Structures are given as C-alpha cells and as structure tokens.
Design a protein with these regions (language model features):
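Short, histidine-centered active-site or binding-site loop motifs used for metal coordination
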Residues: 49, 112, 246
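Alpha-helical structural context
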Residues: 38, 111, 158-159
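Acidic-aromatic/histidine active-site loop/patch
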Residues: 108
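N-terminal membrane-proximal hinge/A-helix region immediately C-terminal to the signal-anchor transmembrane segment
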Residues: 1-103, 118, 122-130, 150, ...
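Cytochrome P450 heme-thiolate monooxygenase catalytic core
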Residues: 1-8, 75-85, 100, 116-271
Length: 271
C-alpha cells in the first residue's frame, strides 16, 4: 500500500492545532499518554509548522522496527526538530538530514560508549560527592539547583574541557539564564510558537532570549577561536575532537557547525 495512503488512514488527534501545540509545549507526556489512550498505539497529530502530520508510535515492536530496521523505509529528517532552531542553530546533528546526519553521528557516537561513559560516570560521582560534602545538617537544599550544577559541570568539562576560570563561569551563568526561560509554560510558548516570537525589548521573553543567546554565542565562538589557535591533539574533550575531525575530502568543521553542535550537546546534556 502507498505510504501516503497508509498515513492518511491512521487515526488523527481531533482537537484544534493551537490546543495541541499548547499541550505539547506545556504537558507533553500527558498529551501523548491521553492521545494513546484515545487513538491507540499508532496515531497522527496535526500541528502547525514542523509538527504537522507527524506519526507517533508507542508499540515496542513498531518502535524497534523503525529504529533498527535495515530496509531504509524510515528517515529521520532534521526538519522535524526545526522548532529547536532558535536554541541550537541549524547545523547540529539534530537538524541534519541523510548522509550529513549519519556522518555527524559516526563522529560523535564514540564519545558515548565504553571507556568514555565510565570516565563520565566517575566524573559525575566525584562532582556529586564534592557537592554533598558541602551540605550542612538541617540545611534546606534546593535539589534542582544542585542537580543542575552537577549537570552543567559535567557538560562543561566533557564537552569543552573547561574545569574552572572566567569563561567557565560565564558560560555556566549564561546557559542557566537561557535554560530558565524554558521552565515556565508561559515563557516557553513565547520561545516555541513562531507567532509569539516578537522582540519587544529585553523585558519580553523573546527579547530576553535573543539577548542572552547573543552573549552565549559570543562566549562559544571565543572558546572555539582560542582552541583553534592552541589546538592540542592529545586533549580528550568533545570540542577538541570536533576541531580535529575531517570529512572524506579532508575538510574540517566550520565555526558555525562547531557552535551548533556545542549548543546541541549543551542543551541535550542538560536535559
């Protein structure tokens, strides 16, 4: 049967697109659970933009077929993640298609296997022990802030090779500011719904995001420039790996590609 016809025959979530988009932004797990209960383990959604006409699967065997099948029936178009462009740019692995996507994955995946994962695990345990050692008996702890501190320290050390210093503190502080804009459903709507992406000054959610992102961009490009000038092939952090990588024609990654991949790793690692 024609794939387009098969897709057309799938049960489709019936609520209006704006309501679905709001539910997706504010309560994504409830939205998917409720849709599965009403429409079954394979259903289609209709939202605006890149989330229009998407098919969701919850059956484990169907998911396995999509992820591991060798017949190339299923693609992973980067456009499906277009809603993340304001955060990640458009040259990170999540936004790439086809051969470019596979090539970038092959470059990155060795950093998340075997000995590398064990090193990251040891680092997480050390950072956690050091943090907990500073707690006092009967002291009230904001656990979310403590866990965020661990996450960001791990990211900055494994991705950038930064352990301390002015740029470490600047990137960490600015990243926290940008991430904080996604913590409220109301603020998130201004970041992810195109019609609400209006720069009304630094006091507006979108305006504040643009200004925070601009500062973070400058910090990342400055770090990339410093690392290119002082490239050390024996360093093991991911930024060093990406700077030293070459494609089949011997071309390296551009500053924009490096920046977008770093943003992807920063946000994905934090989540």
């Amino acid at each position: 049967m024609n794939q387009n016809l098969m897709t057309a025959l799938l049960p489709t979530v019936k609520s209006p697109s704006p309501i679905q988009l709001w539910q997706w932004i504010t309560e994504p797990l409830d939205y998917m659970d409720n849709s599965e209960r009403e429409y079954g383990d394979i259903f289609k959604i209709r939202m605006s933009g890149v989330l229009n006409n998407c098919v969701f699967l919850s059956d484990p065997k169907a998911i396995q077929q999509v992820l591991t099948g060798t017949d190339k029936q299923f693609a992973a178009p980067g456009s499906i993640n277009g809603i993340l462009k304001p955060f990640l740019g458009d040259r990170g692995v999540l936004l790439l298609d086809g051969g470019e996507h596979r090539q970038r994955r092959q470059l990155l995946m060795p950093q998340f296997h075997g000995d590398k994962i064990r090193v990251y695990t040891e680092l997480i345990c050390k950072l956690t022990r050091d943090l907990v050692a500073g707690w006092q008996v009967d002291e009230t702890i904001n656990l979310r802030e403590q866990m965020q501190s661990i996450s960001l320290s791990v990211i900055l050390q494994t991705v950038f090779g930064l352990y301390e210093g002015e740029r470490y503190e600047q990137i960490q502080a600015k990243l926290i500011q940008v991430i904080s804009l996604t913590e409220s459903p109301v603020k998130s709507s201004f970041l992810f719904i195109p019609a609400l992406q209006q720069d009304l000054g630094a006091w507006s959610p979108w305006g504040r995001f643009l200004r925070d992102r601009e500062v973070l961009d400058r910090l990342l490009y400055a770090e990339i420039a410093d690392r290119r000038r002082n490239y050390q092939p024996d360093r093991s952090d991911i930024l060093n790996l990406l700077i030293g990588s070459k494609d089949a024609e011997g071309n390296g990654m551009s500053d924009i590609e490096l920046h977008d991949e770093l943003m992807t790793l920063l946000f994905a690692g934090h989540e």
